[in-house]
């Protein structure tokens, strides 16, 4: 399936919701530290997570450790700075979808590393500032899975 990457996430319920999305879709979740919470935070548990859902979660000490450990072939960043809509590209099996922290988004050095050709945005009304992280991750995962014909779903 796909890999969801949360760079320095800050809000536990968002991460909890994304863990559930990963469990429901077969995605693997990568959390890049520092995190704005502890992984045993009860607010993560409020998302109704079962023990088995945690099997898809991997933590990395920082961005460089993530790149070294995963050696991702293709990264897609989600940002309000994106020049392409999320549905205008072909997302493939094993691709990595990278999201920034809730209050500040991805830093410029990561957007540059990924390259701006792979920085996507989700359409919003002009006066909207940003989407909730867990909502944006859900939109992206289901669009990517749709492109694969919802392979493996029931």
Swiss-Prot record:
Gene Ontology terms describing biological process: wobble position cytosine ribose methylation; wobble position uridine ribose methylation
Keywords per UniProt: Cytoplasm, Methyltransferase, S-adenosyl-L-methionine, Transferase, tRNA processing
GO molecular function: RNA binding; tRNA (5-carboxymethylaminomethyluridine(34)-2'-O)-methyltransferase activity; tRNA (cytidine(34)-2'-O)-methyltransferase activity
Cellular component terms per the entry's GO annotation: cytoplasm
Gene3D superfamilies noted in UniProt: 3.40.1280.10
Reaction it catalyzes: cytidine(34) in tRNA + S-adenosyl-L-methionine = 2'-O-methylcytidine(34) in tRNA + S-adenosyl-L-homocysteine + H(+); 5-carboxymethylaminomethyluridine(34) in tRNA(Leu) + S-adenosyl-L-methionine = 5-carboxymethylaminomethyl-2'-O-methyluridine(34) in tRNA(Leu) + S-adenosyl-L-homocysteine + H(+)
Compartments it resides in: Cytoplasm
EC number: 2.1.1.207
Amino acids binding S-adenosyl-L-methionine: 78, 100, 122, 130
Described purpose of this protein according to its UniProt entry: Methylates the ribose at the nucleotide 34 wobble position in the two leucyl isoacceptors tRNA(Leu)(CmAA) and tRNA(Leu)(cmnm5UmAA). Catalyzes the methyl transfer from S-adenosyl-L-methionine to the 2'-OH of the wobble nucleotide.
Assembly notes: Homodimer.
Protein name, per record: tRNA (cytidine(34)-2'-O)-methyltransferase
Lineage: Bacteria, Pseudomonadati, Pseudomonadota, Gammaproteobacteria, Cellvibrionales
Gene, per the UniProt record: trmL
């Amino acid at each position: 399936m796909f890999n969801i990457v949360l760079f320095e996430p800050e809000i536990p319920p968002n991460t909890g919701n994304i863990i559930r999305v990963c469990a429901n879709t077969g995605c693997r979740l990568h959390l890049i530290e520092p995190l704005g919470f502890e992984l045993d935070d009860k607010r993560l548990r409020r998302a109704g997570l079962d023990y088995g859902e945690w099997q898809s979660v991997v933590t990395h000490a920082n961005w460089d450790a993530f790149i070294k450990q995963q050696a991702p072939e293709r990264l897609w960043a989600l940002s309000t700075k994106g020049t392409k809509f999320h549905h205008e590209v072909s997302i493939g099996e094993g691709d990595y979808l990278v999201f920034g922290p809730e209050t500040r988004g991805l830093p410029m050095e990561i957007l540059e590393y990924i390259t701006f050709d792979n920085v996507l945005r989700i359409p919003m009304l002009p006066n909207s500032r940003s989407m909730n992280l867990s909502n944006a991750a859900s939109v992206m995962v289901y669009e990517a899975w749709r492109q694969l014909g919802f392979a493996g779903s029931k």
